[in-house]
Amino acid sequence: MDRESFKRWLDSYGHAWIGRDPVAAAALYADDATYQVTPFNEPLRGRDAIYEYWDGVAKTEERIQFDSEILAVTPEHGIARWWASFVRVPPGLETKLDGIFLISLDASGRCQSLREWWHKLQ
């Protein structure tokens, strides 16, 4: 992985989230990708499971903002800090997230593995 491909992936991730587009979000992942939303839950496995997750996000979040900062890139992994804010519907609860991604991309630029850690302010 290089910095440019990681930035491109992060930008696409942000656009998919802000656009509430589960198809675009799922397209960022390899067929057999894993997505670990929290360290305490089993990872989602496969693009179909990731699509289902993002479909739920699209139905329950509005006024989404997202930004990220690359912290480190190695040939195997990218690490980024990210921020998001949105209104959860229902009940109209304003939410802010501040988190860290650990990501590996395959040769085609799709995510093979994503692990995240985040904190929430509501």
Model-assigned labels for residue ranges:
Residues 44-45, 66:
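A broad, structural micro-motif
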Residues 32-34, 94:
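Short hydrophobic/aromatic segments of transmembrane alpha-helices and their interfaces
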Residues 14, 39, 70-72:
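Structured beta->alpha junctions
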Residues 13-16, 36, 86:
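Alpha-helix C-capping/helix-to-loop hinge sites
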Residues 34-44, 56-58, 117:
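A short gly/proline-enriched turn/hairpin at secondary-structure junctions
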